Curated annotation (Swiss-Prot):
The active site is at 362 (proton acceptor). Residues 230-250 are annotated as: Linker. Pathway: Nucleotide-sugar biosynthesis; UDP-N-acetyl-alpha-D-glucosamine biosynthesis; N-acetyl-alpha-D-glucosamine 1-phosphate from alpha-D-glucosamine 6-phosphate (route II): step 2/2; Nucleotide-sugar biosynthesis; UDP-N-acetyl-alpha-D-glucosamine biosynthesis; UDP-N-acetyl-alpha-D-glucosamine from N-acetyl-alpha-D-glucosamine 1-phosphate: step 1/1; Bacterial outer membrane biogenesis; LPS lipid A biosynthesis. It is an enzyme of class 2 (transferase). This is Bifunctional protein GlmU. InterPro entries: Bifunctional_GlmU, GlmU-like, GlmU_C_LbH, Hexapep, Hexapep_transf_CS, NTP_transferase_dom, Nucleotide-diphossugar_trans, Trimer_LpxA-like_sf. GO terms for biological process: cell morphogenesis; cell wall organization; lipid A biosynthetic process; peptidoglycan biosynthetic process; regulation of cell shape; UDP-N-acetylglucosamine biosynthetic process. Keywords: Acyltransferase, Cell shape, Cell wall biogenesis/degradation, Cytoplasm, Magnesium, Metal-binding, Multifunctional enzyme, Nucleotidyltransferase, Peptidoglycan synthesis, Repeat, Transferase. Mg(2+) binds at residues 102, 227. It comes from Staphylococcus aureus (strain NCTC 8325 / PS 47). The keyword Transferase applies. Its cofactor is Mg(2+). It catalyses: alpha-D-glucosamine 1-phosphate + acetyl-CoA = N-acetyl-alpha-D-glucosamine 1-phosphate + CoA + H(+); N-acetyl-alpha-D-glucosamine 1-phosphate + UTP + H(+) = UDP-N-acetyl-alpha-D-glucosamine + diphosphate.
Length: 450
């Protein structure tokens, strides 16, 4: 059976009080609507149509070709929004799910179960519901004496007795696609909001003797909609708990989950330890037996087995096995550290390749460079890579020793087994097995201060 999805993403989100389009506000480093799209695609649908309105181009820019789009010029209600997908879906057979773009916590597993329940019951429509303690603002599930769905009533149209019901509609539905578009043309806007409500389609189906099912989820967090910054914060916290819980169940030690933020696309190997205050985002891959020290930040990077990152920032970089970074080091984009490398305190590495066993232990800047195997870079060494217009490369061979407070003025190549004396400013290439000294000879005037 063919399956389709409609994501409702046309709302202005005035309560967010933001210039940014509502569904593009981020949860766990990713726009809300992107979380929804990934869950929808993961549920196995064949085609997705996203309904966009204000800020349409920005949504398209994020989702790209993963979705088709329909434009809703006026926001006249959820039924009106779904009807905008008519040109893409009206003649399709199969099941269509409707999901709100501001429900970033919905999972593909719940959508798969909703679709299966809907199709197994041979229903024309199925609503995803939940029972919550504070149902204010949600449509209520009104059941008849036999427990079947009678209707869904919106908050502003509900009687007091209906407002006391704590089973609510999530705003997520599964429909027989043909039935959906047939009934949408019959929906009226005679309600307190003057809008065309999608739940009215369910009433029309029931009035014709059709089958409408309710599938209740026990995970209330999944259906949480985000309408303001407070709810955005709640969604962020919920996603954080979910992600950390997943990693801990898969063998990762997280010392303080409440202060640890791990993005949804991060992978972490077993027996890795994450200390308090850590942030790991983007498409970061962390191996086994790694230690990420407190207050470190890692983005879009690869950390191999046995490495240790202490109170450092790592962006778009790679760290080899058993390598030690920090404390207070910064790996900028393009930093590539081999195995058993040491990058110590107050060292900055940018677009540089440090081969296995290389050491840069203190107070150095290494940029646009290659440092050979087992080479030691002394405290205060600087690669002078920029002339105000262009960047130039520094190459240091293997098994070399660069003393403290050395300037390597690029472009320059230092060979293998070279000793560069402390305090030197090196402007010329140095061949293998050499000593390079480039500093003024010391003059001492005895008795000068008497």
């Amino acid at each position: 059976m063919r399956r389709h999805a409609i994501i409702l993403a046309a709302g202005k989100g005035t309560r967010m009080k933001s210039k940014k389009y509502k569904v593009l506000h981020e949860v766990a480093g990713k726009p809300m609507v992107e979380h929804v799209l990934e869950s929808v695609k993961g549920s196995g649908v064949d085609q997705v149509v996203t309904i966009v309105g204000h800020g349409a181009e920005s949504v398209k820019g994020h989702l790209g070709e993963r979705s088709l789009y329909s434009f809703q010029e006026e926001q006249l209600g959820t039924a009106h929004a779904v009807q905008m997908a008519k040109s893409h879906l009206e003649d399709k057979e199969g099941t269509t799910i409707v999901v709100c773009g501001d429900t970033p916590l919905i999972t593909k597993e719940t959508l798969v179960t909703l679709i299966a329940h809907h199709e197994d019951a041979n229903a024309q429509a199925t609503v995803l519901s939940a029972s919550i303690q504070q149902p204010y603002g949600y449509g209520r599930i009104v059941r008849n004496a036999s427990g079947r769905l009678e209707r869904i009533v919106e908050e502003k149209d509900a009687t007091q007795a209906e407002k006391d019901i704590n089973e609510i509609s999530s705003g997520i539905f599964a429909f027989n696609n043909k039935t959906l578009f047939e009934k949408l043309t019959q929906v009226k806007n005679d309600n307190a909001q003057g809008e065309y409500y999608l739940p009215d389609v369910l009433s029309l189906i029931l009035n014709d003797g059709g089958i409408v099912e309710v599938y209740r989820t026990n995970d209330v967090e999944e259906i949480m909609g985000v309408n303001d910054r407070v709810m955005l914060s709640q969604a962020e916290k919920a996603m954080q708990r979910r992600t950390n819980h997943y990693h801990m169940l898969n063998g990762v030690t997280i010392i303080d989950p409440d202060s640890t933020y791990i993005g949804p696309d991060v992978t972490i190997g077993s027996d890795t330890v994450i200390e308090p205050g850590v942030r790991i985002n983007g498409r970061t891959e962390i191996g086994e037996d790694v230690v990420i020290g407190q207050y470190s930040e890692i983005n879009n990077s690869t950390i191999e087995n046995g490495a240790c990152i202490q109170q450092s920032v790592v962006n778009d970089a790679s760290v080899g096995a058993n390598t030690k970074v920090g404390p207070f080091a910064q790996l900028r984009p393009g930093a590539q550290l081999g195995a058993d490398v040491k990058v110590g305190n107050f060292v900055e590495i940018k677009k540089a390749d440090l081969k296995d066993g290389a050491k840069v232990s203190h107070l150095s800047y290494i940029g646009d460079a290659v440092i050979g195997e087992r080479t030691n870079i002394g405290c205060g060494t600087i690669t002078v890579n920029y002339d105000g217009e262009n960047k130039f490369k520094t190459i240091v061979g293997k098994d070399s020793f660069v003393g403290c407070n050395v300037n390597l003025v690029a472009p320059v190549t230092i060979g293998d087994d070279v000793l560069v004396a402390a305090g030197s400013t090196i402007t010329d290439d140095v061949p293998n097995d050499s000593l390079a000294v480039a500093r003024a000879r010391q003059t001492t005037k005895e008795g000068y201060r008497k």
